């Protein structure tokens, strides 16, 4: 319930901004009042990392407190569906921990032959399994056929699923720090969160061409060079 309320508060606040832009003062006030009411309802993340992330994003929980919930036991309990939002909130206070969780979570899939994002994944599934491109050897489990959870058990589990691709926007928006701040991508701000990375290279498509970005970590400070379309 707390996670759903947090999402509703975020939606109402965005609704207030849109209403203000459209000069609808009445609807703007309704959205603001409803969002304020939600702020007064006590909430509990109940140890759920995704719930803590949404409560943090909605201003219903301090970012530092949410970070402690998300960091607990590393990549355990991370949702493929909500990976971006969870890591984004963690990176606001602890870039290195966010990167470490991403590495462990996504690397497990890559080491098992993934070329696309899986519908669901738990790092514990990798134990005693081989690549998805090979038939299991004697004594091995099949990470596709023998693993899964909820309604994703066995071969019903998709190995090419868009909702699990949150690693991509996280790397682009948070790690490389590429933020669109002008309508139509006319203006871009670059504010990387490198953590303990030594360098970053990224290519970002825009309506005017591809932005090429290179960032070096110089004693904790990013040195940014780029090639932007005309």
Regions found by a protein language model. Name each.
Residues 32-33, 99-230:
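Non-catalytic C-terminal accessory modules of carbohydrate-active enzymes
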Residues 3-142:
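Catalytic cores of carbohydrate-active enzymes
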């Amino acid at each position: 319930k707390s996670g759903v309320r947090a999402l509703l508060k975020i939606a109402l606040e965005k609704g207030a901004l849109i209403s203000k832009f459209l000069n609808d003062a009445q609807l703007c006030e309704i959205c603001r009042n409803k969002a304020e009411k939600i702020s007064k309802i006590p909430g509990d993340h109940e140890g759920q990392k995704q719930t803590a992330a949404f409560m943090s994003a909605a201003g219903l929980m301090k970012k530092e407190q949410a970070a402690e919930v998300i960091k607990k036991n590393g990549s355990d309990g991370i949702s493929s569906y909500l990976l971006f939002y969870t890591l984004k909130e963690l990176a606001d206070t602890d870039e290195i921990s966010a990167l470490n969780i991403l590495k462990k979570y996504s690397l497990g899939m890559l080491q098992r032959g993934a070329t696309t994002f899986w519908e669901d994944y738990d790092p514990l599934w990798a134990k005693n399994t081989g690549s998805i491109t090979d038939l299991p050897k004697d004594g091995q489990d099949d990470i596709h056929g023998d693993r899964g959870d909820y309604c994703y058990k066995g071969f019903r589990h998709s190995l090419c699923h868009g909702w699990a691709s949150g690693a991509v926007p996280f790397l682009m928006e948070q790690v490389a720090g590429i933020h669109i701040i002008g309508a139509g991508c006319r203006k871009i701000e670059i504010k990387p969160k490198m953590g303990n990375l030594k360098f970053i290279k990224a290519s970002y498509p825009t309506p005017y061409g591809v932005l090429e970005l290179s960032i070096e970590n110089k004693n904790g400070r990013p040195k940014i060079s780029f090639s932007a379309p005309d």
